[in-house]
Regions:
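Classical N-terminal secretory signal peptides
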Residues: 1, 134-137
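N-terminal "first-domain core" detector
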Residues: 1-33
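A short, structured beta-strand/loop element
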Residues: 28-64, 83-102
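Amphipathic, non-membrane alpha-helical segments in soluble helical-bundle scaffolds
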Residues: 63-70, 115, 119
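Elongated alpha-helical scaffolds
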Residues: 68-79
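Charged/polar positions within long, soluble alpha-helices
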Residues: 78, 82-89, 130, 134
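Charged/polar low-complexity intrinsically disordered segments, enriched in acidic residues
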Residues: 92-135
Length: 137
C-alpha cells in the first residue's frame, strides 16, 4: 500500500508495502508504509513517518518523527548493541546512560536472537552511510 499523499504529512520519498518487509513483523503488522517528507505541522521541516492502517482508515497511531530524532534513535539503538557496562559513559554525543544495568544483556540477547533480520539492515545502513560520506568529500 502506498503512503497517502492527501494527509498533512506530505511524502517526498516513501517505502510502499512496508508490511511485507517489516522485519520480524513481516505480514503481521498494520504498518503499511514509511516516508520522508514535509512535516505535518510545519512544511518547512522534514520528518519521517511510520504509516499505520489497521483497517480501512489511516490510524492516528501513525508516528511522525523529526528527522534528527530518527537519526538519534538509530545512534542509540546501535550504541545499545555494543554497550559494555564497565565502559565509561556516555558512548555517544547523545549522553546516554544505563538506566537498568541488570537488563543491558537483554538488548544484546535480543540482537543475537534476531541477528538474521537485524544484521542485513545494519550492513545496508553502513553501506549507505559510506556512500553518503564519500559524496561529501
Amino acid at each position: 500500500m502506498k503512503a497517502p499523499d492527501h494527509l498533512k504529512h506530505k511524502p517526498i520519498i516513501a517505502v510502499s508495502d512496508y508490511d511485507k518487509i517489516d522485519g520480524i513483523y513481516a505480514n503481521q503488522t498494520d504498518v503499511r508504509a514509511l516516508s520522508v517528507g514535509e512535516a505535518q505541522w510545519d512544511n518547512k521541516e522534514i520528518s519521517v513517518k511510520i504509516w499505520r492502517r489497521p483497517d480501512e482508515r489511516w490510524s492516528r497511531q501513525s508516528e511522525e518523527i523529526p528527522l534528527h530524532r530518527a537519526l538519534d534513535l538509530s545512534i542509540l539503538t546501535i550504541a545499545s548493541f555494543i554497550t559494555d557496562i564497565d565502559a565509561f559513559y556516555p558512548q555517544t554525543s547523545l549522553r546516554e546512560e544505563i538506566v537498568q544495568e541488570g537488563k543491558v544483556q537483554k538488548i544484546k540477547d535480543y540482537y543475537t536472537e534476531n541477528e538474521a533480520t537485524l544484521r542485513p539492515r545494519l550492513e545496508e545502513l553502513s553501506k549507505i552511510l559510506d556512500k553518503f560520506f564519500a559524496k561529501k568529500k
